[in-house]
């Protein structure tokens, strides 16, 4: 009887290990696919930068200049020099778009309350929690203007704490879910004096 229980436990352990490895493999595949999609969009964006003449200066404060690439609308790029990472940023967000690139969640540059959401893929926002206060973050608009920020705070918020996420106390906030999905890793950035 003990031998049979041991065999069942061993088989169950192997099955759980295989399930975990399968999940890890699937997540890595998704991360690689997302990284490729972001790289392809960055390449296209580099060729499609809107010139200052084509950017509408009479836009509402919450509207940002945008370009369309392969049916998706982008408002800029984010660069993280300390992470050696550059990503395109989509104009609006939904869960499908997050599979390809970080997305503007709310706010804008003009109103100094831009919030960007990204998936926790390694090739997207998966390393946000490694940023340190003082690290540089650069947002480049579709008309080529660079906005420099420094990380002021890295915090963890509850997944349901949308009021704090969008409170507008920082000109740039970036967030992603943690690996359990129960909380949001949030990076708060201040405008940099070193322009």
Residue ranges and their predicted role:
Residues 4-195:
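Solvent-exposed, non-transmembrane regions of membrane-associated and secreted proteins
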């Amino acid at each position: 009887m003990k031998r049979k229980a041991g065999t069942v436990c061993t088989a169950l352990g192997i099955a759980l290990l295989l399930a975990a490895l399968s999940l890890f493999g699937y997540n890595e595949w998704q991360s690689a696919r997302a990284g490729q999609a972001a790289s392809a969009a960055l390449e296209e964006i580099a060729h499609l930068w809107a010139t200052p003449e084509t950017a509408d200066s009479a836009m509402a404060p919450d509207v940002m200049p945008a370009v369309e690439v392969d049916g998706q609308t982008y408002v800029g790029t984010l660069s993280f020099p300390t992470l050696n990472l550059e990503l395109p940023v989509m104009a609006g967000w939904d869960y499908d778009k997050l599979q390809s690139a970080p997305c503007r969640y709310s706010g804008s540059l003009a109103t100094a309350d831009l919030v960007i959401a990204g998936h926790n893929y390694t090739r997207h926002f998966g390393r946000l929690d490694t940023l340190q206060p003082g690290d540089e973050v650069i947002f480049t608009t579709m008309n080529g203007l660079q906005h420099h920020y420094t990380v002021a705070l890295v915090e963890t918020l509850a997944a349901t704490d949308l009021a704090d996420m969008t409170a507008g106390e920082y000109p740039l906030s970036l967030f992603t879910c943690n690996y359990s999905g129960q909380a949001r890793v949030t990076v708060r950035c201040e405008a940099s004096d070193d322009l």
